[in-house]
Regions:
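Core SAM-dependent methyltransferase catalytic element
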Residues: 124-141
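Active-site rim elements
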Residues: 58-65, 122-124
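Peripheral/terminal regions associated with large enzymatic or DNA-binding modules
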Residues: 8-11, 28, 89-91, 128-131
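Conserved class I S-adenosyl-L-methionine
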Residues: 18-50
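A short glycine-rich, Lys/Arg-flanked "PGG" loop and its adjoining helix->strand segment in the class I
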Residues: 2-17
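Short, solvent-exposed loop/turn segments at secondary-structure junctions
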Residues: 25-26, 89-95, 140-141
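C-terminal helical/coil "lid" or tail adjacent to the Rossmann-like core of SAM-dependent
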Residues: 90-120
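Short alpha-helix
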Residues: 63-87
């Protein structure tokens, strides 16, 4: 993450924003990512780094949650150029049904709006059900 944030800091002007849609840790996503996703998911990882064997190899699907939620104070200290403007947990079912893991969609296009409406009704419990989070970072320096 250090290389990514250093490069983003170099490229983004003050007031500029980064918009991220990242895997998120909830009771539901913990079950889904641990048992149905091919990449590692370790919310208890002690650090932000993990073993890798090369480009696009090695990962921790919980890393964004670790950085922006669990270790938020550390992020704010290490990257004072960035302010977390918004974290919005989302999509407990649409991501999965749209083929988010395998690219094979189980959700017909015509049903998207119905699923979105259904998920919006779940807002009071979204912190327990979301599989991803919409994250907005603003460069302040």
């Amino acid at each position: 993450p250090w290389s990514f944030f250093r490069e983003a800091t170099r490229c983004v002007v003050p007031g500029g924003k980064m918009f991220l849609m990242e895997p998120w840790v909830t009771a539901w996503s913990n079950l889904i990512y641990r048992h149905f996703h091919h990449e590692p998911f370790d919310p208890e990882a002690k650090d932000w780094e993990f073993e890798t064997t090369g480009p696009l190899a090695g990962a921790n699907q919980a890393l964004s949650w670790i950085i922006f939620s669990r270790d938020r104070e550390r992020f704010e200290k290490e990257f004072p150029e960035w302010r977390i403007e918004r974290i919005e947990p989302r999509m407990p079912f649409r991501y999965l049904l749209s083929g988010g893991f395998s690219f094979r969609s189980f959700m017909p296009g015509w049903s998207h709006e119905a699923w979105r409406t259904f998920e919006n009704c779940l807002q009071p419990v979204m912190n327990k059900l979301a599989t991803v989070a919409y994250i907005v970072l603003v460069k302040v320096k």
